[in-house]
Design a protein with these regions (language model features):
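Hydrophobic residues in alpha-helical segments
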Residues: 31, 41, 63-64
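Acyl-donor (CoA/ACP) binding surface of acyl/acetyltransferases
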Residues: 1-26, 30-36, 74-186
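Short, conserved alpha-helical segments within structured domains
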Residues: 44-48, 69, 141
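A short hydrophobic/aromatic micro-motif that marks alpha-helical segments and, especially, helix-coil
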Residues: 48-50, 63, 168, 183-184
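Short, surface-exposed helix-loop/turn micro-motifs enriched in polar/charged residues
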Residues: 43-44, 65, 96
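A short helix-loop-beta-strand connector motif used in the catalytic cores of GNAT acetyltransferases and
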Residues: 58-72
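Conserved GNAT-fold acetyl-CoA-binding loop/helix
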Residues: 37-58
């Protein structure tokens, strides 16, 4: 693993960049305050823009740490307005692996944008940051997230039945993964 931190990434339609404190209102409006947008993530809606500001302030501070990876997802045509985020949510240095998590404003679902962002981050983590393995997981009640992972080139690795307490219920979750060697195979 090579600790390179969160650097900006451009794709066909997106700019993935570090969060700025000025992103708080857009994040709050676009997804952090919307319960309908948060059905399948581990955290609850932010009660106020202040909660969002505090989260972003922590992230901005963490950008000093070169093993902190968290990108604001923006449309290239509007790089000052965040529509989602994607980040490394867990790391296992012993096996040179990490897990990614992501969220996208519901207003942008079904357009291929999350797949585009995930593909770019997988390349960054496997080639540039030199992780050997990247995984992602989702509650099986959200099969669209599994399709995003598959379209981004990740392979299905298994389902853990009744393995996570999520939003007041015990649920199943599935895991997808990719190795550096998978990326090299194309």
């Amino acid at each position: 693993m090579k600790k390179i931190g969160t650097q900006s990434i451009e794709t066909k339609c997106l700019l993935l960049r570090p969060f700025l404190e000025s992103d708080a209102q857009a994040m709050y409006d676009n997804w952090a305050s919307r319960p309908d947008n948060l059905l399948h993530v581990t955290w609850d809606a932010h009660e106020s823009p202040e909660v969002t500001k505090q989260s972003i302030a922590r992230w901005v501070e963490n950008y000093q740490n070169m093993d902190f990876y968290k990108w604001a997802i923006c449309l290239k045509e509007n790089p000052d307005s965040v529509i989602g985020d994607i980040s490394v949510v867990d790391m296992d240095v012993a096996v040179n692996a990490c897990e990614v998590g992501y969220i996208l404003s519901k207003d942008y679902w079904g357009q291929g944008l999350m797949t585009e962002a995930l593909k770019a981050v997988l390349i960054y983590l496997l080639q540039d940051a030199r992780f050997n393995r990247v995984t992602a997981r989702f509650v099986t009640a959200n099969p669209a997230s599994g399709r995003v992972m598959a379209k981004a080139g990740m392979g299905y690795e298994g389902t853990f039945r009744q393995a996570v307490f999520h939003k007041g219920q015990v649920k199943d979750f599935s895991v997808y993964g990719i190795l550096t060697s998978d990326l090299e195979k194309g």
